[in-house]
A protein has these predicted regions:
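Short, basic/aromatic beta-hairpin or loop at an interaction surface
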Residues: 115-125
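Short beta-strand-centered segments at strand-helix junctions
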Residues: 123-138
Length: 188
């Protein structure tokens, strides 16, 4: 797959919210080119946005237990879908089989039991992956890996002497004025 990479350090995990993609740059072996693995993701819905910035993977877990916050439980109950205070591993657990805990409290990178939410703003701020994609990343991503989250609806890249632009839908709650920013973006 060809994709224009986000404007971010090419190390560890990089998440582009607008593109709804995760990129993993494993440390290259001496003398070998840098590899990048990329997968589609689901991100935080309006009102539950995924934060931008830099953090690290502080824990890794297989068959995680989900302990939803009171606010998440309340929202589920209001929508006619009550959830328990503790959800054990298994097919009803929305975290799926694997999770990475981030240095930001309450934010995770994890699998899902509802794959239709990948590619959408469907979470309470966490980053969701298809079960097979989180399984692949879980085998590769070590504890302490740097995680950079950006929101770049417009990405640029050079390929064979030509400048390419890839545009994604601007997230509904993105406060930036992208019409004013067009000239600045194109000047770079």
């Amino acid at each position: 797959m060809s994709a224009i990479l986000p404007n971010a350090p090419r190390e560890g995990i990089v998440i582009n919210l607008a593109a709804m993609r995760i990129f993993y740059y494993p440390k290259p072996k001496k003398g070998e080119p840098q590899l990048v693995y990329t997968h589609p993701i689901g991100v935080g819905k309006v009102g539950w946005s995924t934060p931008e910035g830099t953090t690290r993977v502080v824990a890794r877990e297989t068959d995680p237990i989900w302990r939803p916050s009171a606010a998440v439980r309340r929202e589920h109950a209001e929508n006619g879908d009550p959830v328990a205070k503790v959800v054990k591993p298994g097919p009803d657990n929305p975290l799926g089989k694997y999770k990475f805990t981030l240095g930001w409290p309450s934010y995770l990178i994890h699998g899902t039991n509802k794959p239709y939410g990948v590619g959408l703003r469907s979470s309470h701020g966490c980053i969701r992956l298809y079960p097979e994609d989180i399984e692949q990343l879980y085998q590769m991503v070590p504890l302490g890996t740097k995680v950079t989250v950006v929101n770049q609806p417009f990405v640029f890249g050079w390929h064979q002497g030509q400048l390419h632009l890839q545009a994604y839908t601007v997230l509904e709650d993105d406060p930036r004025d992208w019409k004013k920013a067009q000239k600045t973006l194109l000047a770079k």
